[in-house]
Amino acid sequence: MDLQPSIDVTSPDQYSAGTPTPAAIVAGEVPASEAPRPLSAFDMFSIGIGPSSSHTVGPMRAGLAFSTELCALPDYSHLSHVTIDLFGSLGATGRGHNTDRAVLLGLAGYDPETVSIETVESLIPQIASSGRLPFAGGREIPFDIESDIRFLPRTVLSYHVNALTITAYAGESLVLERTYYSVGGGFVMAQTNNDPEHPEIASLASAQETTGMCTPAPYPFSTAAQLLAQCTRSGLSIAEVVRANELSARSEVALDAYLDQIAHTMFHAIEAGISSTGILPGGLDVPRRANALAAQLRARAEKAFSASERRGWAGVMQDPLRAMDWVNLYALAVNEENAAGHRIVTAPTNGAAGVIPAVLGYLVAFCPEAGASFPDFSPSNLAGISELPLDESSESASCRRASIHEFLLAATAIGALIKTNASIAGAEVGCQGEVGSASAMAAAGLAQALGGTPQQVENAAEIAMEHSLGLTCDPVGGLVQIPCIERNAIAAVKAINAARMALWGDGRHTVS
């Protein structure tokens, strides 16, 4: 039986022989023209379900890749059972992050971008009651949740701390075995040999991503210095450099439609979080707060204050920090949706999914540069922030769409730099790699949308990242709730402050 990989793998591991390493690129030993193609907005932003990109979205994609490959094998018709081994961090916090459920959803043929929340919540009870796994391809096989999924936190594979192995059998015969590594942000690597000490690694990629990786970028960069040099030589902004790279691999219509989809999904997550009440799952009894906070802020926005009240900060128009309350609301709403296992945008991870939507919400609600008619625009937005049009229907809508696209493209550049040269995986580098990265991306995006120069945009990201260093990944009970939800709100406010600090300077700074 041929057990060699038949999965769609591209983009050899960046650390393999002959490929420039991040250290060599940072040291200036490799020119930009020889650096790997920068990661895309399609890489840095993806739609999925909570609560974790590395522990939920990635394992679900791994399960789907395994089932897709397995269904194409001739022995699939004789499939009798499947086992799942979760190693390292996946084994340690997998229960709190629903890693087991995520892998089973993937094996059942579901994708994190499109699976319904009803299916997500019903699959485990269905398997537990029937003792059968509805496998992709229409088959059902016996499955015991207690014995066929093993949590092995003390076993850490050599390539990455987030690893899982899925094995399929026909009776006593091995049909297929694959080991996957969920390396953060929903990115998944597949092991293509059977040597655990010297694994050969390749990334799982869609056909669209494969096409993009094979197309040279007109403005390649792997460091901030290279990015700024490309901007200086071309006269383009950071967002324009990223857009040009994107358009070398896909059409403008496809790019803009994807950016619209990402923005709408972020705004819908805000609205969903605001409209939901109750206790978050997992056993910590953490109550949702966004709904009550939204009601309080709306009441304050509509209240008629007395003359004495208006002399204080109680008057909504007199409160100099009123926007901060709405930013906090947006971040809390998204991260409560993530903690509930609902649909959000991985940006760049699920644990940090509330930062960029919160700052994006600030941009469209409070900034005239994005079409907001401040101070007349009411941030209470009773119609819902997700209903704000992103089209050519009006000057403000067109301005809003352009600002959002600039924001997301500049954020992509910063996220790509961090992912290439460091890590966005909390299990690998702590929360500085998740919330810190998201704060830096959001700061850069906001500075770009507010008209910052490339140097100011880079400086905004640097300020936000510098003051996120040292954050640990310390979720209580292995759940993405405490301190994660509040930490997103703090990071969003930090991003706005970083952008404003950078915009008052000329972009020159000491730390890089």
What are these model-derived regions, one by one?
Residues D75-G88, G371-L382, P389-D391, E395-A413, ...:
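Beta-strand segments within the central parallel beta-sheet cores of soluble alpha/beta enzyme folds
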Residues F45-A65, A339-V359, V429-A440:
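Conserved phosphate/anionic-ligand binding catalytic regions in large, soluble enzymes, centered on
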Residues E34-I49, A65, H81:
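N-terminal signal-anchor module of multipass membrane proteins
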Residues P5-P31, A370-C399:
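Intrinsically disordered, low-complexity terminal tails and inter-domain linkers enriched
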Residues E252-F374, S396-G430:
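Accessory "access/gating" subregions that flank catalytic or transport cores
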Residues D111-W313:
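C-terminal regulatory domains involved in ligand/effector binding and gene-expression control
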